[in-house]
């Protein structure tokens, strides 16, 4: 197009812009040449000579006069102004036509390139005609609007003109071909998409063909990787974006050859004026259809105005139809008219324009949509005679051509494909409007299309305004073709078949001759042949109706004068037609969707049927063995029947033979040969039967054996299943329990690690023996901390593990088995605990960290053992021997020396703990902080301040053998933890009770402090033997320097949840009193339960055999023993329940196990200062100093002694422990050994 414009500008840029008629004629010639150049050199279209640009601007000025300057109509007006007739057009009429037809003109312009851009006027129109532009031009320049300056514009159009949509690529797939096309600025209708296809596949597709019912456009949905039909709905059209893939599906090949489509390249033979008129008609008619599109396309229109809307290839644009037709004929010859619509449009427009010269005449008859249908357009032309050439004869001839048998067939075929009924209605409406409003329009008889008609300049000029108006109108009609052409360029370009219809009216002439028409765009791109050539190529257009033929162009101009109203009316008709078409498309899509749904339903049903069949077939195969068995059984039956018959025959034969023999012998009768032969036959049959049966029997026997073997296998499998399944279930249950225990242990360890508090907690003494002070081997094994639980009963499961444990209780095995399992688990856990102790003891950590590590270790031990240890001693006695640190959790195992001094502290601690326990009410999980006493000869870390100090002092006093058992270190509250900077207090390595297990501590609210105190005191007597413990305790107490104060701090450490002030040391006294009361109450309860506990002594002995109870000579052995002892008591049940029960057991053992404690103390003394801790729950855990063996022996002896005595107080051995805590442990085992 740029080339065309350039050539036009070069030839007569001023003439093109200013002079309409003279320049138009030259432009026609140029456009004929340029059309060829354009399609060949569309890329060059970007260059518009300045002259052409000036001409375009002039055209723009004309458009400015017209309401649609920017539209194709504007260009057409400018073009018309170049033509005398165009100038003759009243400015109002032109404006109105511009308003209405500019969109149509754009569309028509799209169609025009197909028709050919021969007319000189069409030269500017050509520039304006987007159809004239090649894809390259439109791609590179956006598309020329005026064809003048637009060609020079950059590819990206200005936002106002391009609708602010950048160009994008769209991939068009037609059959096996895939092409790229530029997206239009805006896609307002499906016609734009069709135009894209027509433009990309000019030789294969035409707008009319695409509009057929058997051709559908599908868009690819990348997310679903599927194509779905593209509906002519904004929501669907918006989905066409850059890189979208559009596919054209057709049930049949392109039905009509391009010649059928109006605007076929061969068709554009009409005179340029006639073409111009036809353009006007087309744009006029097409405009309603494309109105919405063109409104969106106005930018394109403006562009087209500047450049003959390159997308509107149809010559129906402002270019003179004669020129278009001639060029289009060339195009058709070139084969660009292969797209039926484009070629047909161009042909119709050109022939009619050439014939009619005036666009006015053409305007009325042409409806782009109908024409785009091809048949409708031609019929419309024929009916309206709108494309009346300069001479009415030509119009008539053209009408005749429209009605020519060849043309009608193609047109009707296309019409049927493209909503024939709707188009027919539109045609009727348009005809009425044109005939009524424009009575002057008479069918111009144009028996033949002569190049003269195309060339007729007078008519062109006379109808110049009409042509311009018509072109504007036609541009909208071209919209379809133009849209086809410009589809890649703009949405705004609407694909109005009616616009094409004008060229289609030409098409009746051309379509028959040239079936292949290039897509509108390409046809525009193609050099336009002269209208004469087109006429030569095309059969003479069918004569138009007499009315149309009669109407002269001037008359048509008169109609054009009425054009504004007519255009509006036609526009409304076109819009209605478009709405109807949209509805039809919607219905079609709905039907398609329904068909898809039905297909899916059928497919689903098929799949279900198939699945059923497969299942049945599978069952068939499953029952194949049964079928074999049935077959064999049938064979067996047949075999038996044969045997029966055989035996019968033999018996009969034998009888007969014997009778005959007897008769012969006795009676000496003659033997009848026949009888003998009969018998011989029977015998032969019998012998054969026997042979056959003998042959059959092996296979039968094999089959029977197989069946029997299979049955035997089934029986064996069933028996094996019945026999092994219970064991399998039991093993699975055991595994579940084991895993549960492991998870519980890991949970405790994690909780301990997470709950450590910083050493400098305000409520807890910041200074505690540092891990550095205590060597890892010497560090006492943390006694298992009691799970939190209340004396009254276990708390609700704390977490999913507890719930799981409760559920597993139902499957718990007898206590003996449980104990064995627990022992094994305890041993494993002991090893883990030892490793964890080493791992968790960090010398760099503060005392709190150290205690936390110890607590972690204790947590690793079973909760039951922890509960016992804690409840018996109600204090964790930490004694570190030089060789090893053994935590002796014996309420009474404290050196006698430290008893007197620390008895008060322990009482205070117990009281404070009792208070704390009562306040906590098993609230947040609390852990009593006890600090490990340092190894003998080692002084404890600096005296702890605050509750931890008291805690430490209490532990040391107990280690020293204080008169009273060391009360458990006060528990930690969640509140206390929160106060401590949201860091969890590190659990002390010595046994501690969590807040959940108030029973564990002698100060638990349910137990009177007296009981607790008594229990603690009862367990103390043998603590004198623990020299090392005493030394450690003394050292610790000395280091602290405040023995009395230590107890207070310890009590404070546990903290009172209600008060929240656990750091006050004054509370220790009250705590001690409460603790004693709780202990006293517990003592009474435990005395009652002692007998019950003894009953379980036998069961507990198995657990008591564990070495953990004995005092180990080495710290490691003692640690293992302690861990094992704790493990024996350790259950996988919920920590709370186990701890509660263990606490009760431990208290009972503490009260009743004084003798056992004494024995344990003696054993400890034998161990050279080893500390014997007799814990009701966990037994006496002693860390021996020098001679661990002696300590162990003593401990065992003490355990045996305590066992002999009814006192079931826990000795070093677990036997005494379990004996004293029999009832509670039994319950614990039954409920929580899991």
Swiss-Prot record:
One Gene Ontology cellular component: cytoplasm
Q: What keywords would UniProt list here? A: Coiled coil
Q: Which residues form a coiled coil?
A: 412-436, 565-594, 630-666, 1077-1105
Annotated region described as Disordered, given as residue ranges: 1-88, 107-129, 330-350, 498-548, 754-793, 815-852, 928-1011, 1028-1070
Compositionally biased intervals (Basic and acidic residues): 1-11, 55-69
State where composition is biased (Low complexity): 12-25, 817-837, 952-965, 993-1004, 1028-1039, 1046-1068
Q: What is this protein called?
A: Coiled-coil domain-containing protein CG32809
Species per Swiss-Prot/TrEMBL record: Drosophila melanogaster
């Amino acid at each position: 197009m740029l080339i065309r414009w350039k050539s036009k500008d070069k030839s007569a840029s001023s003439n093109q812009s200013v002079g309409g008629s003279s320049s138009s004629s030259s432009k026609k010639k140029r456009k004929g040449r340029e059309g060829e150049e354009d399609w060949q050199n569309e890329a060059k279209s970007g260059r518009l000579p300045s002259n052409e640009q000036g001409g375009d601007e002039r055209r723009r000025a004309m458009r400015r006069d017209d309401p649609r300057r920017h539209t194709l109509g504007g260009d057409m007006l400018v073009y018309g102004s170049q033509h005398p007739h165009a100038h003759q057009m009243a400015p109002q009429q032109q404006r109105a036509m511009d308003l209405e037809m500019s969109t149509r003109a754009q569309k028509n312009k799209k169609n025009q390139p197909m028709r050919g851009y021969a007319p000189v006027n069409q030269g500017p129109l050509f520039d304006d005609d987007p159809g004239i532009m090649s894809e390259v031009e439109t791609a590179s320049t956006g598309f020329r609007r005026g064809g003048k300056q637009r060609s020079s514009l950059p590819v990206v159009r200005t936002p106002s003109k391009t609708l602010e949509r950048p160009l994008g690529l769209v991939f068009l797939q037609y059959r096996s071909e895939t092409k790229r096309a530029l997206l239009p600025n805006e896609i307002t209708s499906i016609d734009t998409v069709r135009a894209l296809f027509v433009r990309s596949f000019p030789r294969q597709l035409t707008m009319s063909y695409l509009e057929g019912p058997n051709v559908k456009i599908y868009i690819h949905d990348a997310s679903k990787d599927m194509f779905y039909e593209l509906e002519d709905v904004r929501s669907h059209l918006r989905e066409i974006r850059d890189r979208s893939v559009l596919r054209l599906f057709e049930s049949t090949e392109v039905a009509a050859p391009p010649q059928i489509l109006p605007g076929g390249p061969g068709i554009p033979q009409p005179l340029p004026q006639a073409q111009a008129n036809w353009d006007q008609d087309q744009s006029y008619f097409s405009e309603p259809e494309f109105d919405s599109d063109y409104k969106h396309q106005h930018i394109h229109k403006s562009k087209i105005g500047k450049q003959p809307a390159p997308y509107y290839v149809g010559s129906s644009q402002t270019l003179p139809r004669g020129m278009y037709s001639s060029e289009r004929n060339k195009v058709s010859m070139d084969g660009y008219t292969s797209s039926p619509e484009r070629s047909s449009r161009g042909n119709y427009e050109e022939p009619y324009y050439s014939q009619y010269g005036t666009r006015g005449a053409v305007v009325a008859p042409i409806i782009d949509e109908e024409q785009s249908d091809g048949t409708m357009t031609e019929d419309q032309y024929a009916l309206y005679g709108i494309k009346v050439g300069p001479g009415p004869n030509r119009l008539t001839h053209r009408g005749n051509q429209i009605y020519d048998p060849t043309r009608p067939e193609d047109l009707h075929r296309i019409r049927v494909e493209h909503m024939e009924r709707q188009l027919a209605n539109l045609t009727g409406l348009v005809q009425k409007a044109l005939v009524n409003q424009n009575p002057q329009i008479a069918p111009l008889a144009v028996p033949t299309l002569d190049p003269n008609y195309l060339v007729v300049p007078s008519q062109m000029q006379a109808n110049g305004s009409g042509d311009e108006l018509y072109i504007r109108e036609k541009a909208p009609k071209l919209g379809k073709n133009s849209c086809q052409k410009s589809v890649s360029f703009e949405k705004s370009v609407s694909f109005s078949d009616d616009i094409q219809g004008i060229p289609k009216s030409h098409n009746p002439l051309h379509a028959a001759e040239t079936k292949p028409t290039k897509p509108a765009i390409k046809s525009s791109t193609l050099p336009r042949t002269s209208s004469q050539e087109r006429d030569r190529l095309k059969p003479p257009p069918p004569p138009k109706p007499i009315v149309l033929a009669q109407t002269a162009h001037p008359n048509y101009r008169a109609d054009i004068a009425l054009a504004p109203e007519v255009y509006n009316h036609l526009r409304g008709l076109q819009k209605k037609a478009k709405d109807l078409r949209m509805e039809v498309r919607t219905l079609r899509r709905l039907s398609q969707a329904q068909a898809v749904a039905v297909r899916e339903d059928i497919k689903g049903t098929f799949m279900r049927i198939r699945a059923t069949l497969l299942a049945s077939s599978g069952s068939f195969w499953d029952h194949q063995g049964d079928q074999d068995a049935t077959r064999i059984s049938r064979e067996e039956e047949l075999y038996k029947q044969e045997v029966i018959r055989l035996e019968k025959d033999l018996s009969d034969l034998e009888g007969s033979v014997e009778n005959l023999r007897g008769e012969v012998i006795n009676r000496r009768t003659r033997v009848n040969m026949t009888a003998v032969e009969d018998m011989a036959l029977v015998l032969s049959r019998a012998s054969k039967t026997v042979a056959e049966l003998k042959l059959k029997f092996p296979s039968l026997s094999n089959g029977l054996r197989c069946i029997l073997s299979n049955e035997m296998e089934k029986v064996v499998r069933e028996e094996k299943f019945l026999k092994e399944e219970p064991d399998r279930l039991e093993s699975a249950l055991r595994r579940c329990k084991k895993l549960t225990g492991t998870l519980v242990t890991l949970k405790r360890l994690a909780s301990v690690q997470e709950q450590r508090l910083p050493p400098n907690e305000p409520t807890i003494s910041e200074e505690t023996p540092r891990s550095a002070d205590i060597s890892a081997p010497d560090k006492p094994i943390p006694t298992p901390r009691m799970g939190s639980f209340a004396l009254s009963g276990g708390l609700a499961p704390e977490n999913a593990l507890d719930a799981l444990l409760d559920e597993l209780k139902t499957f718990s095995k007898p206590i003996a088995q449980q104990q064995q399992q627990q022992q094994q688990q305890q041993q494993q856990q002991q090893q883990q605990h030892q490793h964890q102790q080493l791992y968790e003891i960090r010398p760099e950590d503060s005392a709190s960290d150290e205690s936390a590590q110890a607590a972690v270790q204790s947590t690793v031990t079973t909760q039951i053992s922890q509960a016992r240890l804690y409840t018996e001693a109600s204090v964790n006695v930490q004694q570190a021997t030089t060789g090893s640190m053994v935590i002796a959790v014996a309420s009474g195992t404290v050196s006698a020396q430290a008893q007197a001094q620390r008895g008060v502290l322990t009482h205070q601690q117990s009281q404070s703990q009792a208070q704390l326990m009562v306040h906590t009410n098993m609230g947040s999980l609390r852990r009593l902080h006890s600090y490990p006493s340092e190894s003998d000869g080692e002084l404890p870390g600096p005296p702890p301040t605050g509750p931890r100090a008291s805690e430490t002092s209490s532990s040391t006093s107990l280690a020293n053998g204080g008169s009273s058992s060391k009360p458990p270190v006060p528990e930690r509250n969640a509140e206390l933890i929160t106060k401590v900077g949201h860091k969890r207090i590190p659990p002390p390595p010595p046994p501690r009770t969590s807040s959940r297990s108030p029973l564990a501590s002698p100060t638990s609210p349910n137990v009177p402090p007296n009981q607790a105190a008594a229990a603690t005191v009862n367990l103390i007597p043998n603590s004198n033997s623990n020299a090392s413990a005493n030394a450690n305790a003394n050292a610790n107490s000395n280091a602290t320097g405040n023995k009395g104060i230590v107890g207070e701090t310890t009590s404070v450490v546990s903290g009172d949840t209600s008060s929240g002030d656990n750091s006050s040391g004054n509370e220790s006294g009250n705590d001690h009193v409460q603790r004693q009361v709780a202990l006293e109450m517990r003592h009474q309860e435990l005395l009652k339960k002692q007998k019950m506990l003894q009953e379980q002594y036998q069961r507990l002995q198995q657990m008591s055999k564990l070495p953990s109870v004995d005092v180990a000579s080495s710290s490691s052995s003692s640690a293992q023993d302690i861990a094992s002892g704790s493990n024996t008591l350790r259950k996988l049940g919920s920590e709370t329940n186990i701890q509660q029960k263990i606490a009760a057991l431990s208290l009972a053992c503490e009260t009743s196990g004084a003798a056992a404690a004494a024995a344990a103390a003696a054993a400890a003394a034998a161990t050279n200062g080893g500390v014997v801790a007799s814990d009701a729950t966990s037994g006496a855990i002693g860390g021996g100093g020098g001679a661990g063996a002696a300590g162990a022996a003593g401990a065992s002896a003490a355990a045996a002694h305590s066992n002999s005595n009814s006192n079931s107080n826990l000795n070093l051995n677990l036997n005494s422990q379990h004996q004293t805590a029999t009832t509670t442990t039994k319950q614990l085992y039954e409920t929580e050994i899991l």
